[in-house]
């Protein structure tokens, strides 16, 4: 069985690598597309915060996928079938995510792993193995994710345009409103961490909420101080070439330069969002790769399973996320940040705030939503705020198609790998 365990660990790293290549774009894609961060800066920031989130808080979410959708109870599912099934789920998820990343499709990692887990449950022809009620609840929440995310993004960006961008003096309007925006985004991002349960092992709900409120208050006053000493004269070379801001600067008027100052402030706020979203993603999505590994190890070696072993697995998963982002992450980042619709920092900020609010609200209601669907829906909402012509409908068609086939693709690949493993090891 040690050879099978080696295959499982390698498969876990491979899956984490592909999660990093595909899913991390949710955190940094809008920032890169808006020009707030270069691709290298985004990769560096995401690498640090993804790894920290995976190692420090990743263990909280691992039990959900390990036992939340498929029952490994001895009287229903034998240990051998459970090991083969979870290994097949790992490999199926990794392969499908690699295909999607190569094509630049931002698909849901959770869709893929759930489809893969359901696949081996179906091949066993044991309805008792699968918790169908939980699966149905998950599917309903996933369908709602892009709609809710897009709606919030539309409202937030419409407010920003009316309250700041369309004013005669957008800089003065931004100075008044920015402290409130920074406080709200810190509060929303903090709620994402609290309500997802990621910080539960470290601190209880009430103290965590007080800390988040304190950080929001600090962000409010720090933003007031920061804007007061902000360098208002922004030089052209500070704007990334090829972005929408670069084209605006080439036609610069007095209003245009004020608009550029406002966008630069939004760029700093967007960097904060990228850091928080990367940390939250690392703490949550490392479970998609590591939960099957942990479950298999505990089944094969129950006496030696401990928190130290889990920490090693989480570190391996965090390293896989970073490697995947650094190698193939640019493909999906390009899709989310540039190909759906043109983004500026104010639009990217609206995407980030909408995503944080949607995820926090869903977590408080107990809905395990797809972050990918929320972010893509939020980007779409920004596009709709500017009109249908602002959206690349061909890219949207490809993305939606990839969403529909992710679950069945994961299930089909899982069945193939399950049968192969049975043939090899039985």
From Swiss-Prot:
GO cellular component, one term: plasma membrane
Membrane-spanning intervals of the chain: 1-21, 37-57, 83-103, 104-124, 140-160, 183-203, 207-227, 260-280, 309-329, 365-385, 399-419
Main location: membrane
GO biological process assignments: phosphate ion transmembrane transport
Membrane topology: Multi-pass membrane protein
Keyword Membrane attached: yes
Single Gene Ontology MF annotation: phosphate transmembrane transporter activity
Domain of life: Bacteria
Record has Disulfide bond as a keyword: no
Compartments, record wording: Cell membrane
Pfam families, sorted: PHO4 (PF01384)
Keyword terms of this UniProt record: Cell membrane, Membrane, Phosphate transport, Transmembrane, Transmembrane helix, Transport
PANTHER family: PHOSPHATE TRANSPORTER
Membership in a protein family: Belongs to the inorganic phosphate transporter (PiT) (TC 2.A.20) family.
Annotated function: Potential transporter for phosphate.
Name the UniProt record assigns to this protein: Putative phosphate permease CT_962
Organism placement in taxonomy: Bacteria, Pseudomonadati, Chlamydiota, Chlamydiia, Chlamydiales
């Amino acid at each position: 069985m040690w050879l099978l365990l080696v295959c499982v660990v390698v498969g876990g790293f491979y899956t984490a690598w592909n999660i990093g290549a595909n899913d991390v774009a949710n955190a940094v894609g809008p920032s890169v597309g808006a020009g707030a961060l270069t691709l290298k800066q985004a990769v560096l920031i995401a690498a640090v915060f993804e790894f920290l989130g995976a190692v420090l808080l990743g263990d909280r979410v691992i039990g959900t996928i390990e036992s939340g959708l498929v029952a490994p109870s001895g009287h229903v599912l034998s240990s051998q079938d459970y090991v083969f099934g979870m290994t097949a789920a790992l490999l199926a998820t990794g392969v499908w995510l690699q295909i999607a990343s190569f094509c630049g499709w931002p698909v849901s990692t959770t869709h893929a792993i759930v489809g893969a887990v359901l696949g081996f449950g179906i091949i066993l022809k044991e309805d008792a193995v699968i918790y169908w009620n939980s699966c149905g609840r998950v599917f309903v929440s996933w369908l709602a994710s892009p709609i809710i995310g897009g709606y919030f993004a539309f409202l937030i960006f419409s407010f920003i345009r009316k309250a700041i961008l369309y004013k005669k003096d957008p800089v003065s309007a931004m100075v008044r409103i920015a402290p409130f925006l920074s406080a709200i985004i810190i509060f929303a991002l903090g709620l994402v961490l609290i309500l997802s349960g990621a910080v539960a092992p470290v601190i209880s709900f009430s103290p965590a909420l007080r800390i988040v409120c304190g950080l929001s208050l600090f962000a409010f006053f720090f933003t007031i101080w920061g804007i007061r000493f902000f360098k208002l004269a922004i030089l052209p070379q500070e704007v990334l070439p090829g972005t929408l801001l670069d084209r605006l600067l080439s036609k610069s008027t007095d209003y245009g330069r004020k608009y550029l100052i406002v966008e630069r402030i939004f760029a700093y706020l967007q960097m904060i969002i990228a850091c928080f979203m990367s940390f939250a993603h690392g703490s949550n999505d490392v479970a998609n790769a590591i939960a099957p590994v942990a479950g298999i190890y505990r089944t094969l070696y129950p006496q030696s399973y401990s928190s130290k072993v889990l920490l090693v697995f989480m570190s391996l998963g965090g390293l896989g996320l970073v490697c995947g982002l650094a190698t193939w992450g640019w493909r999906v980042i390009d899709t989310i940040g540039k190909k759906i619709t043109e983004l500026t920092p104010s639009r990217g900020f609206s995407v980030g705030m909408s995503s944080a609010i949607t995820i926090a609200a869903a977590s408080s209601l107990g809905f395990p939503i797809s972050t990918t669907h929320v972010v893509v829906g939020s980007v779409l909402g920004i596009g709709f705020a500017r009109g249908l012509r602002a959206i690349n409908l061909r890219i949207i068609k490809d993305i939606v198609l990839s969403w529909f086939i992710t679950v069945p693709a994961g299930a089909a690949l899982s069945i193939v790998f399950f049968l192969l493993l049975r043939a090899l090891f039985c």
